[in-house]
C-alpha cells in the first residue's frame, strides 16, 4: 500500500492503494485525477449515471460536473480543487468519488464554520480539507459511485487514506446505506433537514389541495389568485424550448437574488448555457411574465423520478410570486409528469404549509485530530437528538388531513 503524496498546496498528486480486504477476482487500484475532463464522458456516466435517457441523478452527470469546471465556478481558484478518486480494475473504471480539496466552507450547505473557528482558536489549520459533494448543490445522491459493495468498500478505504493528508474528510448528502458503510469505517454521522413533496398519485393540483386541511387549502388558493390578479402569467419551458435569451434572463434574475443579499453568486451565465446545451433533458424553467415582459423565473432540474428546485430570482417584486414559481408550479409540473418527488431544498418552515414535509438528510465526517474528533462526535450526538425533535415538531404541523402515501 502506497500512501498518497501531496504537493505544497495540499493537492493530491498520486494515489495507488490496493485494499486486499475487499479485493475479489482482480486487484483494484485507486488514483486521483484533477479534472472531470480527464475522464471520458461515457466512462464516467456508465459508473455514475447508468440511467437513460434521463440520468438517475443529473448532478453527477459528466456534463454537469464539466460545466462547473469549464465555467470557472468550481476550480482551484474558487477554492474547489477537483480531486476525482477513480477505482480501477484491469484498467477499467470500477468506481469513483467526486472529491474536492476545499480552502473554505462556502457552497456546501452542511455547515462546519464553527469547527473551523475552533481549530483556528487552538492554532490548528482546518483548511485544506477533503470534501465529497456536488459543488453548490444540497441534493442527495450516491457518493460512492460503484456497482457492487466490494467496490464501495474500496472507495471508502481509498478516500480515508487520502484524507490523512488533510484535516478532515466530509461526505455530504449521501444515502443511508453509504453513510452506514462510512460509519463502519469510523466516520461520524451528521443529520440535517430538508423539505420534500411526495406525489400520492394526485390527478391534478386540485386533487392535491383536496388532501390538505381547509385552512391550508384556502390559503394556497388565495396566494395563487393574488398572483393572477397582479397580472402575472406563468410558462414552463423544457429542454430545447429554453432558448439563449431565456438563459440570459434567468442569469440576470439569479444575480439579482445574490445582490439583494449582498453576496457574490457562485455560478455564471456560461455555466447555465452549458447545462442547457449538454443536459437539456434535465432542465426546466418556470418563467413569470407581466404584460408580455419576463419579470421572474425559477430553474428546476429533473431526473426520471424527481424534480429539484434549484434557483430563483425576480427583477420586479410581486407579492407571493416566489411561492408560485418555486413551489406551486413545480408541484403542478411533478403531478403532470407523474414524478414521485419534488425536492424544495433546505431551510424555511413555511414550506411545510405548502405540502413539503421534513426529511432527514445524512452526511459523514472524519477528523484527523483525535481530541477534536471526540468533541465533534459528542456535539453531533446532541445535534442529532435536536434534529429528531425538530422533525417531530414540524410533522405535528402537517397541512395534510391524512399523511399521504407515495405512489
Question: Predicted segment positions?
Answer:
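N-acyltransferase acceptor-side catalytic subdomain
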Residues: 7, 11-407
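Ser/Thr/Pro/Gly-rich low-complexity, intrinsically disordered segments
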Residues: 1-4
Amino acid at each position: 500500500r502506497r500512501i498518497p503524496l501531496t504537493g505544497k498546496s495540499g493537492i493530491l498528486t498520486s494515489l495507488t492503494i490496493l485494499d486486499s480486504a475487499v479485493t475479489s477476482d482482480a486487484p483494484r487500484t485507486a488514483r486521483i485525477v484533477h479534472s472531470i475532463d480527464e475522464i471520458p464522458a461515457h466512462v464516467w456516466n456508465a459508473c455514475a449515471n447508468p440511467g437513460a435517457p434521463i440520468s438517475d441523478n443529473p448532478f453527477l452527470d459528466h456534463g454537469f460536473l464539466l460545466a462547473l469546471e469549464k465555467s470557472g465556478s468550481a476550480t482551484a481558484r474558487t477554492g474547489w480543487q477537483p480531486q476525482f478518486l477513480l477505482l480501477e480494475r484491469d484498467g477499467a473504471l470500477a468506481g469513483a468519488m467526486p472529491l474536492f480539496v476545499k480552502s473554505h466552507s462556502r457552497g456546501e450547505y452542511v455547515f462546519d464554520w464553527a469547527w473551523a473557528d475552533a481549530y483556528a482558536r487552538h492554532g490548528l489549520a482546518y483548511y485544506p480539507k477533503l470534501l465529497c459533494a456536488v459543488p453548490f448543490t444540497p441534493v442527495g445522491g450516491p457518493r460512492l459511485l460503484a456497482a457492487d459493495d466490494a467496490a464501495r468498500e474500496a472507495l471508502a478505504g481509498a478516500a480515508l487514506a487520502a484524507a490523512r493528508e488533510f484535516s478532515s474528510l466530509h461526505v455530504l448528502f449521501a444515502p443511508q446505506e453509504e453513510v452506514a458503510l462510512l460509519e463502519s469505517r469510523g466516520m461520524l454521522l451528521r443529520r440535517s433537514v430538508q423539505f420534500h413533496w411526495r406525489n400520492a398519485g394526485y390527478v391534478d393540483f386540485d386533487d392535491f389541495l383536496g388532501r390538505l386541511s381547509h385552512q391550508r387549502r384556502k390559503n394556497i388558493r388565495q396566494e395563487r389568485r393574488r398572483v393572477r390578479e397582479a397580472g402575472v402569467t406563468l410558462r414552463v419551458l423544457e429542454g430545447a424550448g429554453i432558448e439563449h435569451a431565456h438563459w440570459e434572463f434567468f442569469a440576470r434574475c439569479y444575480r439579482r437574488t445574490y445582490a439583494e443579499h449582498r453576496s457574490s453568486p457562485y455560478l455564471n451565465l456560461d455555466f447555465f448555457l452549458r447545462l442547457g446545451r449538454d443536459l437539456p433533458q434535465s432542465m426546466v424553467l418556470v418563467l413569470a411574465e407581466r404584460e408580455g415582459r419576463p419579470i421572474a423565473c425559477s430553474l428546476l432540474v429533473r431526473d426520471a423520478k424527481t424534480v429539484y428546485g434549484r434557483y430563483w430570482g425576480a427583477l420586479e417584486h410581486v407579492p407571493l410570486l416566489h411561492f408560485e414559481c418555486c413551489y406551486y408550479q413545480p408541484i403542478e409540473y411533478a403531478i403532470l409528469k407523474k414524478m414521485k418527488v419534488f425536492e424544495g431544498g433546505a431551510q424555511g418552515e413555511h414550506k411545510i404549509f405548502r405540502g413539503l414535509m421534513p426529511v432527514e438528510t445524512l452526511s459523514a465526517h472524519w477528523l484527523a485530530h483525535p481530541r477534536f474528533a471526540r468533541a465533534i462526535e459528542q456535539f453531533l450526538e446532541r445535534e442529532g437528538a435536536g434534529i429528531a425533535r425538530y422533525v417531530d415538531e414540524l410533522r405535528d404541523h402537517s397541512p395534510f388531513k391524512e399523511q399521504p402515501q407515495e405512489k
